[in-house]
Amino acid sequence: MISRKSILAVFSCGLIAVGAAACGSSSSGSESGSGPLTGAGSTLLAPLMSKWQSDYSSRTGNTVTYGAIGSGGGIEQITAGTVDFGASDAPFTPDQQKAAPDVVMIPWALSSTDPVYNVSGVSDGLHLDGPTLADIYLGKITTWNDPAIAKLNPGANLPSTKITPVYRSDGSGDTYVLTDYLSKVSPEWKSNVGVGTEVKFPTGVGGKGNDGVSAVLSKTDGAIAYVGAAYAQSNGFDQMAMENAAGKFLQPDLKTIGAAAATVKSVPSNNAISITDPPASATDAYPLSTFTYALVPTNSDKATALKSFLDYAIGPGRAFEADLNFAKLPSQVLAADKATINKIGG
């Protein structure tokens, strides 16, 4: 398990390798396609990326600088061409793909976005379903002993503590995963708030990055938030047991995240895959599971270096996944990844 200190080190500008990606420094590349790489994006990926950077450098002597600035920032920087690759838990929208027609999406990690809470006297594993979670973030449910929560937790001693919803104030793949899920289970959420890396939350308190959200959650009795799986694990947060479409209340782990990914029978041509709220036939699937995508230009002058790092990430780099609550990529996704990597520099 990684420490909170090591997680916090990946967020601020300049704290991963040189940090140029987080600061918007231009990446000019080299004609040979070798040399260092810069990337930026997903904070959910950051703990795994930190392991990749160290191991890849020791194996190859090449450095990878990564700015954990959020998926929205990663999309912006790869579109602007200021980094060699981006990383996002949200796939491109059609408009974003149109703005970056030469950038391909490669699902290179599999994890989850986890609803977590800090309520005095309430232990880990509180039951919640999607519509109730939506109503909390809509501001319709405001106390922890609300009948809707009590009904899902018979016999639990729920306090009248005020609920403080905490959300990401930056462009976030975790926000995308949450809102993608809520839009599938709550018609009111879909029509009034919608899906995106940045949405207008009707109520609550914002925090920048997974670390900012974690800080607000830790100091606020009655808070509910959503963070990447590695952050929930390393901080020891109490995690919701979310009801899936089969009616089972599950927490995220390698089995339940993997079960959600197993519902992917075929990979679309652009590799964009949503596995939130999987069908009831996936009885053990966690409903807020997600892929994280590498965003890579096929016409990069660093094609050789990019392909080397991507091959590492979906190959030897997978050895670090389990300890950080990242599940194994399904074989059909790995096959699509390899085919897409072969398009780079082609």
Locate each region found by the language model.
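N-terminal segment of the mature folded domain
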Residues: G29-A150, L158, N210, S214-S218, ...
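C-terminal motif of bacterial Sec signal peptides marking the signal peptidase cleavage site
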Residues: V18-A22
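Ligand-binding pocket segment of bilobal, Venus flytrap-like solute-binding proteins
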Residues: G171-T263
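Bacterial N-terminal signal peptides that target proteins for export
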Residues: M1-F11
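C-terminal lobe and pocket-closing loops
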Residues: A245-A305
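Bacterial signal peptide processing site
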Residues: G24-S26
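Extracellular/periplasmic juxtamembrane helices and adjacent flexible linkers that interface
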Residues: A156-T161, P279-G346
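Short beta-strand->loop
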Residues: T38-S42, I136, W144-N145, S160-G171, ...
